[in-house]
Amino acid sequence: MYVLLTILTSVLVCEAIIRVSLSSTREETCFGDSTNPEMIEGAWDSLREEEMPEELSCSISGIREVKTSSQELYRALKAIIAADGLNNITCHGKDPEDKISLIKGPPHKKRVGIVRCERRRDAKQIGRKTMAGIAMTVLPALAVFALAPVVFAEDPHLRNRPGKGHNYIDGMTQEDATCKPVTYAGACSSFDVLLEKGKFPLFQSYAHHRTLLEAVHDTIIAKADPPSCDLLSAHGNPCMKEKLVMKTHCPNDYQSAHHLNNDGKMASVKCPPKYELTEDCNFCRQMTGASLKKGSYPLQDLFCQSSEDDGSKLKTKMKGVCEVGVQALKKCDGQLSTAHEVVPFAVFKNSKKVYLDKLDLKTEENLLPDSFVCFEHKGQYKGTMDSGQTKRELKSFDISQCPKIGGHGSKKCTGDAAFCSAYECTAQYANAYCSHANGSGIVQIQVSGVWKKPLCVGYERVVVKRELSAKPIQRVEPCTTCITKCEPHGLVVRSTGFKISSAVACASGVCVTGSQSPSTEITLKYPGISQSSGGDIGVHMAHDDQSVSSKIVAHCPPQDPCLVHDCIVCAHGLINYQCHTALSAFVVVFVFSSIAIICLAILYRVLKCLKIAPRKVLNPLMWITAFIRWIYKKMVARVADNINQVNREIGWMEGGQLVLGNPAPIPRHAPIPRYSTYLMLLLIVSYASACSELIQASSRITTCSTEGVNTKCRLSGTALIRAGSVGAEACLMLKGVKEDQTKFLKLKTVSSELSCREGQSYWTGSFSPKCLSSRRCHLVGECHVNRCLSWRDNETSAEFSFVGESTTMRENKCFEQCGGWGCGCFNVNPSCLFVHTYLQSVRKEALRVFNCIDWVHKLTLEITDFDGSVSTIDLGASSSRFTNWGSVSLSLDAEGISGSNSFSFIESPGKGYAIVDEPFSEIPRQGFLGEIRCNSESSVLSAHESCLRAPNLISYKPMIDQLECTTNLIDPFVVFERGSLPQTRNDKTFAASKGNRGVQAFSKGSVQADLTLMFDNFEVDFVGAAVSCDAAFLNLTGCYSCNAGARVCLSITSTGTGSLSAHNKDGSLHIVLPSENGTKDQCQILHFTVPEVEEEFMYSCDGDERPLLVKGTLIAIDPFDDRREAGGESTVVNPKSGSWNFFDWFSGLMSWFGGPLKTILLICLYVALSIGLFFLLIYLGGTGLSKMWLAATKKAS
């Protein structure tokens, strides 16, 4: 880059020389070199302004000939510099005489290389250029070279300082005399450091203004009291307190550092002799053999000027800022964020340091003395130093000695046009030459909408405390003011003002959802069998309150199943006979009988009207009636014969006459069969499963051995078992050598989820732009030729480099504005409004947006091993988890869901999830979520430059000296609050998964799940001394022929910690419950297919088995539900294949009524009464209608 700058600047100078040549054919050679690297863009733009041929033919080192354009010449220049062995490049247009030749020479001393540029042009072509054209070409070229930011140290006039030019701190005796004042030839470390590249870009852009030290010596800025703090004795000193809130960096070998303090005065910190400041400028370090620099290091990037603008009544506000450094701007009671930030500041007359929310600068050129630099030559004839010199050097000249127009002066001066318009320029031999200093005009900043002239303006990196204007997303908190009621028709949740849109209720691993139009009350179905069994029910609600969502735990007491399921007309209400009274049962029979009679009557009438053999239709009915009568008579006769036979046998009746004598002797007869035939025909065996799935470890994987009274079994192999439904258990039974040696491995299905498998994701947040602007006149700073029109977004103006060096998202603009005297410029060409805009995060939190590429089923299992240890694991399809006894894997046969591509999801880490009603976009698009997206949460918080942005997000409105920048971004936090889960879309409810670890979907689906248990030489010990226990049956609640099952509760009293196992007589049913010291109630889920349960178990804790009777009545819950409801329920695991069965139900009905004969008689009685009542009502209705008809007829006649 260093050599490339030399090439470009040499070409420009060479071009200028050729243009002013009028010879027919001239060959000019120029040499150039530089010791500093340089960005080439500005010089290249000027090079393209030269009227070069559109098409060039270039020969690189004479090796190859390439065709290129002037636009591509830049690449060719880079090639000759970078490539080894390429020593020259020659380009010419269609006319071979129009040629540019660049020759790369060998390195020489400190110079990287020597470049010779040759340009040949025809005299006629040169002659077409006017002097005005020549001037417009040469001046921009010189401006590029002279005003490039990196060559400040080579511009001798930068050391021609305004005012006294003193750059030293009083009391520093070792300060070199060259700082009192700064001279052209002398070295002053306090000033020279300001010209180093990249360190103080703001001052370098306004280098002809005063430094802080110069402003102090020119009495523009006062000194602090005390003016300097010794770090070794500065404990508790106020100046040290201000220094500590600044983030600073001091180079090595500096003994002192200075800054502008909060009072608008200069303060400094210093170390004793032979000590240097450490890199953080907070400590002193002694270095042996090192020579300390004789100067003070500036801790802020600033410049100063003289001003009379009063700032005593000036009040500024920084949006959302509570404190900057030691200055408290406002009182903040909420949460604060603290960070080091680059903050602009200014100092006015009679004011303290004023921090600014943004910095808008404008410069007005003027003819004041500080706007000119005057110099003379050392050794100049009749100069102040006219003695002979060994070096060619310049010397500053006091402009006050030059006469103003209409005034008097002691010296004769000459200068440029600007100087001669304000001062008398002599036509004779002058004492000094004066010229206008570029960028030396009056600088004004905008404060509270008013342009004011500050004494000093600059940047510093300081601690800033900001209030979190937008409240962070709150975690899901319990709703302490909500009210819950366990109503018969459902669980009612009432809020205290916010409107609930959807909710999820869960109990015992079973969840149900509900959605509605936003209301302060929502009614949810009871999950599982919680309506009758009672217990805690967790409810998660989505609402329109400030918080994302709320949760509440409702406790419902156990209730009589017949009271909570009291529907008479619905299906489950009709078949729950145990819940009917005599009146309700009669109503049911009457309704069905009436419907049957009406249907038969209608059918008869229709057939009769159509004359379709009504008599023949009645014949089957008559035959059926006759057959029923015959069966009835036979049954009555048989019963009567049996009764008479019994009476005769006991002597109550003899030939139909009552015998009053001694009773006849009772003969021996066989037992009377009674109703055994009917019972055998109608007997149906019930089925139950305590451990929903139970297998016994086979001998192929079990090896047992006995050691005294103890038995040790080793398991090695694989066992396959079906997973239990939600709330139920799958058990592996391990039997020892003895009958009383039994242990179980239980896997309880705690919950089932249909979880989201995430695809692509990104992080986003809320951002706002902040823009800085500065207007510079044409040919001042970087405003030259067409630089403004060709300004690139990634190119930062030098005066904003101190802010632009951060890694935040930023862009740069340049807008051409008016020029001339009316706009404060000498040059009539357009001025340049340079803009630096950066984005900052509004909230100190970020959101993650993701999509779901698939929905997979996942089970949460609670594993109780053989020793009673409990652990909880999550298993997905085809996944495995390792345990202390081996591993367990899950195989699933299930269907997922579809239709989720039309929306995406948002996660607030640790706080919740939300749904977005738009598909996931892979690229940022304006007007959609994710206009700004980052790859990490920290990148969002810092608004890092690595984040992707949609184009043209920031809108600009330039207004001559200032600019407005605005954005219209989608706020993801508003979207998050509006779509916080749970939400219902496409008849599916989406909610946060268990533990808030993802998103799950509720759909009325089921899954077939199998568990594979793999044992790896696991040993199980059966201890000889067993624990004794007693168990008593408490209750049986729940449903039959349902997936929820029934809950069997036992009261267990044990002498220690162990387990209770129970089985029925044939060993087909097992109950396994833990036992603890003392008395404790334990419950387990079982599944039955009959409403009447009466099962005898044998239980044991120590091998001594005792009987246990489990008895109760269950009800049916919604066996037929064809209603379409939005939302859904949690996935059913291994649904029970046996549905509601009529024969099982009728068997329970007969048991309920006391036997089959009594059941048939009661049914017949109810049917007969219903038919009689029906015809009675028909008769009464017909009679009443007839009387009414007759009365109406008589009245009409």
From Swiss-Prot:
Annotated region (Golgi retention signal), positions in chain: 608-650
Record-marked site positions (Important for glycoprotein C and glycoprotein N subcellular location): 1194
Stretch list, region Important for correct targeting of the glycoproteins to the Golgi complex but not for heterodimerization: 646-650
Positions of the UniProt region annotated as Internal signal sequence for glycoprotein C: 675-690
Site label Cleavage, positions: 153-154, 690-691
Stretches that traverse the bilayer: 583-603, 1160-1180
UniProt key word Lipid metabolism: no
Residues listed as glycosylation sites in the UniProt record: 794, 1035, 1077
Domain of life: Viruses
Cytoplasmic side: 17-130, 604-673, 1181-1197
Keywords for this protein: Disulfide bond, Fusion of virus membrane with host endosomal membrane, Fusion of virus membrane with host membrane, Glycoprotein, Host endoplasmic reticulum, Host Golgi apparatus, Host membrane, Host mitochondrion, Host mitochondrion outer membrane, Host-virus interaction, Membrane, Modulation of host cell apoptosis by virus, Signal, Transmembrane, Transmembrane helix, Viral attachment to host cell, Viral attachment to host entry receptor, Viral penetration into host cytoplasm, Virion, Virus entry into host cell
GO biological process: entry receptor-mediated virion attachment to host cell; fusion of virus membrane with host endosome membrane; symbiont entry into host cell; symbiont-mediated perturbation of host apoptosis; symbiont-mediated suppression of host apoptosis
Secretion signal, residue range per the UniProt entry: 1-16
Cross-referenced InterPro entries: M_polyprot_prcur_phlebovir, Phlebo_G2_C, Phlebovirus_G1, Phlebovirus_G2_fusion, Phlebovirus_NSM
Keyword Transferase: no
Topological region Lumenal: 154-582, 691-1159
Disulfide bonds: 179-188, 229-239, 250-281, 271-284, 304-456, 322-332, 374-434, 402-413, 420-425, 479-482, 486-556, 506-511, 691-731, 704-713, 756-852, 771-965, 777-825, 783-832, 788-814, 818-823, 934-947, 1029-1101, 1039-1042, 1049-1083
Region (Fusion loop): 777-783, 819-830
Start and end residues of each stretch annotated as Internal signal sequence for glycoprotein N: 131-153
GO CC entries: host cell endoplasmic reticulum membrane; host cell Golgi membrane; host cell mitochondrial outer membrane; membrane; virion membrane
Protein family according to the UniProt entry: Belongs to the phlebovirus envelope glycoprotein family.
Name under which the protein is recorded: Envelopment polyprotein
Organism whose genome encodes this protein: Rift valley fever virus (strain ZH-548 M12) (RVFV)
